[in-house]
A protein has these predicted regions:
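Aromatic/basic-lined ligand-recognition segments
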Residues: 40-42, 55-59
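N-terminal interaction modules that seed assembly of large macromolecular complexes
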Residues: 20-47
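Acidic, proline/glycine-rich low-complexity IDRs
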Residues: 3-7, 11-18, 33-34, 47-51, ...
Length: 122
Protein backbone atom coordinates (compact mmCIF):
# COMPACT_ATOMS: atom_id res chain seq x y z
CA UNK A 1 0.00 0.00 0.00
CA UNK A 2 1.22 3.49 -0.79
CA UNK A 3 2.09 5.52 2.27
CA UNK A 4 0.07 8.55 1.22
CA UNK A 5 -2.31 9.90 -1.39
CA UNK A 6 0.41 11.76 -3.32
CA UNK A 7 2.55 8.64 -3.66
CA UNK A 8 -0.46 6.67 -4.89
CA UNK A 9 -1.38 9.28 -7.52
CA UNK A 10 2.25 9.53 -8.63
CA UNK A 11 2.40 5.75 -9.03
CA UNK A 12 -0.87 5.53 -10.98
CA UNK A 13 0.00 8.32 -13.42
CA UNK A 14 3.65 7.31 -13.78
CA UNK A 15 2.69 3.79 -14.84
CA UNK A 16 -0.26 4.61 -17.10
CA UNK A 17 -0.43 6.94 -20.09
CA UNK A 18 -3.35 9.36 -20.28
CA UNK A 19 -5.34 8.61 -23.46
CA UNK A 20 -5.85 11.59 -25.77
CA UNK A 21 -9.66 11.40 -25.47
CA UNK A 22 -9.60 12.09 -21.72
CA UNK A 23 -11.12 15.47 -20.90
CA UNK A 24 -11.47 15.16 -17.11
CA UNK A 25 -10.41 13.14 -14.08
CA UNK A 26 -12.54 11.88 -11.20
CA UNK A 27 -11.37 10.35 -7.95
CA UNK A 28 -14.08 7.82 -7.06
CA UNK A 29 -14.49 6.94 -3.39
CA UNK A 30 -15.91 3.79 -1.85
CA UNK A 31 -16.81 2.73 1.66
CA UNK A 32 -15.29 -0.74 1.88
CA UNK A 33 -16.42 -1.64 5.42
CA UNK A 34 -16.52 -0.06 8.85
CA UNK A 35 -13.65 2.44 9.04
CA UNK A 36 -12.19 1.26 5.72
CA UNK A 37 -12.27 3.44 2.61
CA UNK A 38 -10.94 3.19 -0.94
CA UNK A 39 -10.27 5.45 -3.91
CA UNK A 40 -9.70 4.94 -7.63
CA UNK A 41 -8.84 7.41 -10.38
CA UNK A 42 -10.76 7.45 -13.66
CA UNK A 43 -10.38 9.46 -16.82
CA UNK A 44 -13.58 10.53 -18.56
CA UNK A 45 -14.54 11.51 -22.08
CA UNK A 46 -16.92 14.20 -20.85
CA UNK A 47 -17.02 17.03 -18.31
CA UNK A 48 -19.99 19.22 -17.40
CA UNK A 49 -20.26 21.48 -14.36
CA UNK A 50 -24.07 21.29 -14.58
CA UNK A 51 -24.34 17.48 -14.89
CA UNK A 52 -22.53 15.26 -12.40
CA UNK A 53 -23.11 12.24 -14.63
CA UNK A 54 -20.05 13.32 -16.62
CA UNK A 55 -18.05 11.04 -14.34
CA UNK A 56 -20.00 8.04 -15.68
CA UNK A 57 -18.39 8.52 -19.11
CA UNK A 58 -15.33 6.63 -17.96
CA UNK A 59 -12.71 5.84 -20.59
CA UNK A 60 -10.02 4.42 -18.31
CA UNK A 61 -9.30 3.64 -14.68
CA UNK A 62 -5.52 3.80 -15.23
CA UNK A 63 -5.27 0.37 -13.61
CA UNK A 64 -6.29 1.95 -10.31
CA UNK A 65 -9.30 -0.31 -9.84
CA UNK A 66 -6.87 -3.17 -9.27
CA UNK A 67 -4.60 -0.94 -7.18
CA UNK A 68 -6.98 1.09 -5.01
CA UNK A 69 -5.78 3.63 -2.49
CA UNK A 70 -7.03 2.22 0.82
CA UNK A 71 -7.09 3.93 4.18
CA UNK A 72 -8.61 3.35 7.58
CA UNK A 73 -10.39 6.17 9.34
CA UNK A 74 -13.12 5.94 11.97
CA UNK A 75 -15.55 8.50 10.62
CA UNK A 76 -18.72 9.15 8.68
CA UNK A 77 -18.65 9.30 4.88
CA UNK A 78 -18.63 13.11 4.82
CA UNK A 79 -15.50 13.19 7.00
CA UNK A 80 -13.77 10.68 4.71
CA UNK A 81 -14.68 12.89 1.76
CA UNK A 82 -13.40 16.02 3.53
CA UNK A 83 -10.11 14.25 4.26
CA UNK A 84 -9.65 13.33 0.59
CA UNK A 85 -10.72 16.77 -0.64
CA UNK A 86 -7.99 18.30 1.52
CA UNK A 87 -5.37 15.78 0.35
CA UNK A 88 -6.30 16.22 -3.31
CA UNK A 89 -6.31 20.03 -3.11
CA UNK A 90 -2.80 19.87 -1.68
CA UNK A 91 -1.78 17.55 -4.51
CA UNK A 92 -3.28 19.85 -7.13
CA UNK A 93 -1.27 22.74 -5.73
CA UNK A 94 2.12 21.03 -5.62
CA UNK A 95 1.97 17.37 -6.69
CA UNK A 96 4.23 15.83 -9.32
CA UNK A 97 1.37 15.40 -11.82
CA UNK A 98 -0.71 18.40 -10.71
CA UNK A 99 -0.24 20.23 -14.01
CA UNK A 100 -1.24 17.14 -15.98
CA UNK A 101 -4.45 16.80 -13.96
CA UNK A 102 -5.22 20.53 -14.27
CA UNK A 103 -4.51 20.52 -18.01
CA UNK A 104 -7.89 18.87 -18.61
CA UNK A 105 -11.34 20.46 -18.32
CA UNK A 106 -11.95 19.33 -14.76
CA UNK A 107 -10.98 17.29 -11.72
CA UNK A 108 -13.60 15.97 -9.31
CA UNK A 109 -13.92 13.72 -6.28
CA UNK A 110 -16.88 11.95 -4.74
CA UNK A 111 -18.48 8.72 -3.70
CA UNK A 112 -19.62 6.65 -6.67
CA UNK A 113 -23.22 6.83 -5.48
CA UNK A 114 -23.11 10.48 -4.42
CA UNK A 115 -22.37 14.02 -5.50
CA UNK A 116 -19.10 15.10 -7.06
CA UNK A 117 -17.09 17.96 -5.63
CA UNK A 118 -15.21 19.86 -8.34
CA UNK A 119 -11.61 20.51 -7.29
CA UNK A 120 -10.53 22.21 -10.51
CA UNK A 121 -12.16 23.36 -13.73
CA UNK A 122 -11.08 25.47 -16.67
Amino acid sequence: MMKNVADWIDNVLHNNAVPTDIVAFCFNLYEESDSSWAMELVGTERFDLEDEDWACNEATDFGSRENLYNWKMECEWDEALAYLVNELKQYLSSGKYAELLKSKEGVGVGFVDGNIEILHSK
